[in-house]
């Protein structure tokens, strides 16, 4: 079966045999796929410079099962310009998608969130808000439903000044005790819900929450992007 041209991004690529590539691709309509590009590394390949991360692509493939075969690929536009810490942050996002979402499952809304995150990273000096927004979008796509705006105990709206303790599978409970990991101020929960972070404390709280929420999906295996780039991006990816 051969599909028509689909909007895609290459998340990861690795050499295969003498001249081919295996691509981990994020497609708008088909989700994450493994695709082999035969001869892509040969000197005469017309795909040299095309199958790159962060480049908007149109791709066509054929086949079924766990590995498809690339039939056509062309760029929609130039690669999204990412450098320095923003490039490392984008690599982190790519690894999150590879590690967390299942293959062969469509995530059209998350694909647009991914494109938005890359665009934001290309336009900002501080990548943290874009990272937090994408992590929250990813959790939402996975069905990780959390009510940030209501106390799980009373059902009342959270108060910006009050402290709430997060309990997995239950939500946020009003608490007079402070837990460095699980306690959040009401204004932080509101900021997370709106995905709009005004203060450094709100950003730190959002990072804390996404780390807690993503941990079950990532398991005990560390992210390679953190290991590679943590010395240069300690404030962002730790």
From Swiss-Prot:
Q: What does this protein do?
A: Involved in DNA repair and RecF pathway recombination.
Among SUPFAM superfamilies, the record links this protein to:
ArfGap/RecO-like zinc finger, Nucleic acid-binding proteins
Q: Name one GO cellular component term.
A: bacterial nucleoid
Q: What is this protein called?
A: DNA repair protein RecO
The UniProt similarity line reads:
Belongs to the RecO family.
Organism of this sequence: Aliivibrio salmonicida (strain LFI1238) (Vibrio salmonicida (strain LFI1238))
Record PANTHER family: DNA REPAIR PROTEIN RECO
Q: Which domain of life is it from?
A: Bacteria
Q: One Pfam family, short name please?
A: RecO_C
Choose any GO biological process term that the UniProt entry carries and state it: DNA recombination
| NCBIfam families listed in its UniProt record | reco (TIGR00613)
Q: Which UniProt keywords apply?
A: DNA damage, DNA recombination, DNA repair
């Amino acid at each position: 079966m051969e599909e028509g041209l689909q909007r895609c991004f290459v998340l990861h690529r690795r050499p295969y045999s003498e001249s081919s590539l295996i691509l981990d691709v994020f497609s708008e309509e088909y989700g994450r796929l493994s695709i082999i590009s035969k001869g892509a590394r040969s000197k005469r390949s017309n795909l040299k410079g095309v199958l790159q991360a962060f480049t908007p692509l149109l791709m066509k493939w054929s086949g079924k099962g766990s590995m498809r075969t690339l039939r056509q690929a062309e760029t929609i536009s130039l690669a999204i310009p990412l450098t320095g810490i923003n490039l490392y942050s984008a690599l982190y996002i790519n690894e999150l998608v590879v590690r967390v979402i299942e293959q062969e499952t469509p995530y059209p809304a998350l694909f647009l969130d991914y494109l938005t995150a890359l665009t934001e990273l290309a336009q900002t000096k501080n990548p943290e808000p874009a990272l937090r927004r994408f992590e929250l979008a990813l959790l939402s796509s996975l069905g990780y439903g959390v009510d940030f705006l209501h106390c799980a105990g009373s059902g009342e709206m959270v108060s910006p000044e009050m402290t709430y303790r997060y309990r997995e599978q239950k939500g946020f409970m009003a608490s007079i005790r402070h837990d460095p990991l699980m306690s959040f101020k009401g204004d932080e929960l509101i900021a997370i819900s709106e995905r709009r972070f005004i203060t450094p404390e709100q950003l730190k709280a959002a990072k804390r929450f996404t780390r807690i929420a993503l941990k079950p999906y990532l398991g005990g295996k560390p992210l390679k992007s953190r290991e590679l780039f943590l010395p240069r991006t300690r404030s962002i990816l730790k």
